[in-house]
């Protein structure tokens, strides 16, 4: 059963942390709308997605399509959360650990004068053995849309910006179903849309931006990342909830 760990509100945005066993997930919703959160019929989305080279590839027929939800993620354990509040911002730091000595830090910052939040992910090897990461998310959001239950067909729109060097972004809007982002009848096979830019061009095919719109409830989750290297964003779905993550390109996409 999913329990509410903490809630924080600032700048018109509410962050809801929910815990299910060792998994802590983050929901970002408009302030005042948290009472409408209904989604609990999908897997809780971990705060951090990561993949170590020594760990097996993820299951669910997803090899070569995604590196999300690997055994690396399943080894993470929640150890605590702190919050520093001031008039202009709230900084929430969540700690996760791995039995191999890896310490993960997820930092969320809410701003009083900005409706957007900032998410930063860090990992430190506190053990004696070397490890190689081949995927680490900067952010990830799951259980989309948290205001729906079940499949909620034809209610999620995906917005992306196609572009290239010295060009304007061209908006492309597609239904989640048109991108095959819907679960199988058994909710086992994982479907993924992974896109981004390989190389130091920040815009090369796509702008580092993606938005998921819940047309049934009038809420949109939009994310952007800024990197001077290969980057990616990824839409993922294996059950009733959709997930959106992004950051550095993983080994498969950025190689």
Q: What is each of the regions a protein language model found here?
A:
Residues 2-253:
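Polysaccharide-binding surfaces and accessory modules of carbohydrate-active proteins
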């Amino acid at each position: 059963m999913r329990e509410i760990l903490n809630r924080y509100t600032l700048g018109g945005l509410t962050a809801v942390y929910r815990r299910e066993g060792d998994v802590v997930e983050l929901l970002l919703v408009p302030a005042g709308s948290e009472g409408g959160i209904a989604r609990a019929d999908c897997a809780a989305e971990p705060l951090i997605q990561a993949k170590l080279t020594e760990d097996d590839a993820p299951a669910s027929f997803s090899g070569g399509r995604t590196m999300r939800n690997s055994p690396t993620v399943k080894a993470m354990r929640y150890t605590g959360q702190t919050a520093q509040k001031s008039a202009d911002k709230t900084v929430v730091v969540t700690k996760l650990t791995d039995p191999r000595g890896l310490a993960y830090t997820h930092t969320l910052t809410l701003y009083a004068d900005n409706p957007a939040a900032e998410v930063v992910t860090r990992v430190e090897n506190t053990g004696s053995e070397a490890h190689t990461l081949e995927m680490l998310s900067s952010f990830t959001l799951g259980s989309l849309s948290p205001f729906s239950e079940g499949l909620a067909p034809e209610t999620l729109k995906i917005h992306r910006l196609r572009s290239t060097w010295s060009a304007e972004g061209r908006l492309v809007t597609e239904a989640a179903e048109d991108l095959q982002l819907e679960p199988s009848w058994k909710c086992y096979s994982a479907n993924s849309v992974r896109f981004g830019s390989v190389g130091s061009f920040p815009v090369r095919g796509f702008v580092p931006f993606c938005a998921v719109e819940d047309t049934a409830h009038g809420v949109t989750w939009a994310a952007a990342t800024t990197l001077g290297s290969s980057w990616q964003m990824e839409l993922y779905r294996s059950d009733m909830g959709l997930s959106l993550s992004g950051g550095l390109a993983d080994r498969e996409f950025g190689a």
